[in-house]
Amino acid sequence: VVAHTGNPGQVNYTASKAAISGMVKSLALELSTRNITVNSVAPGFIQSNMTDKLNDDQKNTILDRIPMKKLGDSTDIAKAVGFLCSENANYITGQTLHVNGGLALI
């Protein structure tokens, strides 16, 4: 998400995520002649050991920023990756699929 929205105090982290987006586009162009697609998934806040450590105020602050008002879970990401790896996505390349409950919209 931060590659597309920015995040104060995390320039290095944001830059590393933006670099992945550029790499995906370049690889997609390079490998398209071989009928190879290249895409990425940009997860939002996912229920994990990291989010379990947040206090209620921190969780509520995060949930207030997410239009769907919930954290995702690992199966949400797995389904997105599965789709991009399937024949159903054979004409999709160079894209970043945002799986974040609408967080990147705001």
Where are these regions (language model features)?
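Catalytic tyrosine of NAD(P)H-dependent dehydrogenase/reductases that use a Tyr as the general acid/base
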Residues: 13, 21, 91
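A glycine/serine/threonine-rich, flexible loop-to-helix segment
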Residues: 33, 45-66
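A conserved structural motif in NAD(P)-dependent oxidoreductases
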Residues: 66-77, 88
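Alpha-helical segment proximal to the catalytic Tyr-Lys
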Residues: 29-33, 90
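Active-site "substrate specificity/gating" loop of NAD(P)-dependent dehydrogenases
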Residues: 1-10, 32
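Active-site helix of classical SDR
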Residues: 16, 24
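Short, flexible catalytic-loop segment of classical short-chain dehydrogenase/reductase
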Residues: 4, 21, 38-53
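Short C-terminal tail/terminal secondary-structure segment
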Residues: 5, 82, 93-106
